[in-house]
Amino acid sequence: MARAKFERTKPHVNIGTIGHVDHGKTTLTAAITMTLAAAGSAKARKYEDIDAAPEEKARGITINTAHVEYETPNRHYAHVDCPGHADYVKNMITGAAQMDGAILVVSAADGPMPQTREHILLAKQVGVPSLVVFLNKKDQVDDEELLELVELEVRELLSEYDFPGDDIPIISGSALMAVNALIDNPNIKPGENEWTDQVLELMKAVDDNIPEPEREIDKPFLMAVEDVFSISGRGTVATGRIERGKVKVGETIEIVGIRDTRSTTVTGVEMFQKTLDEGMAGDNVGLLLRGIKKEDIERGMVIAKPGSITPHTQFEGEVYVLTKEEGGRHTPFFKNYRPQFYVRTTDVTGTIQDYTADDGSAVEMVMPGDRIKMTVELISPIAIEQGMRFAIREGGRTIGAGVVSKILK
């Protein structure tokens, strides 16, 4: 049996379902795959398959996530759904499953709940660019005015966290009714059932409102330096994996981080001992750099397109602190705690200056298992940018995972 080839004919977009526990995220995920399977462009996945999500490890943290894929007439989607609330927090912060957009599921019967707010805040902090809302459990609400009220509440909540609350599409329906209809008749066609039609309407809103992500290869060039060699007669070679963009022989690049930024020319690109004209996102390459001595460059610096990234020492981060069971600390930590921040390829010591709760109030003590916003001051400047992931380590073990939510200086 030959392996199925991945046909890349449609643009690919990564999305996920977010929202409060028991509002129907997993049921909706099942409803989407079943509805699109009936329309001929997905493999139907039952609720049970999705809910029994396998464990994965991302940056040393165990997360349960279910991955399903499906297609609309215009796009191919990879969809992530997490069974537990803690899994969502960990997934969004570590970027284990990157989301180009998300479907926020809100129960029409209950309205926005604490985790609805928390997931919207997280989406904002970790840089999920666009949301579409599904008001679920519509079959449990008889009063049209109540639906309108919940919709208004959701829009206000979105606006509060700087999403365009007035413009985000809100589709109402019932994931469970759609699933039940499809169990009775797996071949429902568009126009035959109001509940499955609402799921199709939701997917059309996702198609139209969640923009296609910019491909890694189209972004400005960046490679984090992993190792440095000196080749006699040729000069200095820095090796690493190209994170984004592409680099050609003869191009000017900048070396950023730890010391003053320097500019030089790439005189060679090598991969597996072969010379290339250019290296691109995903390649592990060695770059030969003109006029750079071995001691001028070290692991932890980045090589990038001039002007595309700058070194910083102070930032705000949204952090998940590992529990004792996850291999994290057993005890709390306080202000002026000085762990290492593992950024791309290196550990940099930093001091945590303060902690802030979701409501903006100051927090004195951080416990294992907490999610917290912190302000960090690094001892040396490092190339960092908003949305970048990092780990917090202490004596070589990971005690937290975070994402840069704001650069301060």
Swiss-Prot record:
Residues 136-139 are annotated as: G4. Residues 81-84 are annotated as: G3. Residues 10-214 form the tr-type G domain. GTP binds at residues 19-26, 81-85, 136-139. InterPro entries: EF-Tu_GTP-bd, EF-Tu_GTPase, EFTu-like_2, EFTU_2, G_TR_CS, P-loop_NTPase, Small_GTP-bd, T_Tr_GTP-bd_dom. Mg(2+) binds at residue 26. It is found in: Cytoplasm. Signal peptide: none annotated. CDD domains: EF_Tu, EFTU_II, EFTU_III. Pfam families: GTP_EFTU, GTP_EFTU_D2, GTP_EFTU_D3. It catalyses: GTP + H2O = GDP + phosphate + H(+). Residues 60-64 are annotated as: G2. The keyword tRNA processing does not apply. The keyword tRNA-binding does not apply. Its main location: cytoplasm. It comes from the Bacteria. One of its GO terms (molecular function) is translation elongation factor activity. Residues 174-176 are annotated as: G5. Belongs to the TRAFAC class translation factor GTPase superfamily. Classic translation factor GTPase family. EF-Tu/EF-1A subfamily. GTP hydrolase that promotes the GTP-dependent binding of aminoacyl-tRNA to the A-site of ribosomes during protein biosynthesis. Monomer. This is Elongation factor Tu. It comes from Crocosphaera subtropica (strain ATCC 51142 / BH68). The gene is tuf.
